[in-house]
Amino acid sequence: MDNNVVLTMRGISMTFPGVKALDNVDFTLRKGEIHALMGENGAGKSTLIKCLTGINAFEAGEIRVDGIDGPVVNHSTLDAQKKGISTVYQEVNLCPNLSVAENLFIGREPKTKLGTIDWKTMVKKSQKIVDDLDMNIDVTQNLEEYSLALQQMIAIARAVDMDCKVLILDEPTSSLDDNEVEKLFKLMNQLKAKGVGIVFVTHFLEQVYAVCDRITVLRDGQLVGEYPIAELPRVKLVAAMMGKDFDDLAAIKSEESPVFTDDDILIDAEGM
């Protein structure tokens, strides 16, 4: 395995009843890169992620993770986390009625010599985690006190503190405004600089070109291709996702849109 590669998926195949969800799909993620996983609805993106995170058991292929000896054929979600694979979804999977510190350390709380939770240590460590990521928040406050964007960043901070090597962000910007998206991108670039490999799933093409280094395109459960961001113009990306001829899409794009004047009637309703 290349020293610069943190994750390799080879020949991943999976079938649902009557549907070939994934057909011999390859995917490679490098250390310290943001890699977009693109495709229309039903292309196989979610299924591939679920195979990677241990939710789905795939029928053929293998996964290799940096630092783990030998291939991973199938593993559980817990196994995936232990290998350094973490996912943050658009719907934050944390506990809103618990404090930020409790959410950061849930299931792995520091203990005193008596076996009780060491609250002081947990708060201190939690505050350092968020401070190191330039998140201006009070970890003693309940999670629900913060915006969805900050909640997602807290979920990312938890993953990072659990020594994640591969961070999957599945439609993280769907409910965020432009300012919140910029904050998320800043955090993503900080993690990139630390060597974390990030898989970014989104339908917003402008965001892909704003923050990603490479793009992998899936269509109908198959790999279309893997491209450096600078070598794949948007219209070619759309063509790859849709399975359309590039020249046809370019011709459509070049056609002039009709120009309407004040005298043109667009809608006319009478006697309603």
Model-predicted segments: where are they?
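Glycine-rich phosphate-binding loops of nucleotide-dependent enzymes
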Residues: 2-272
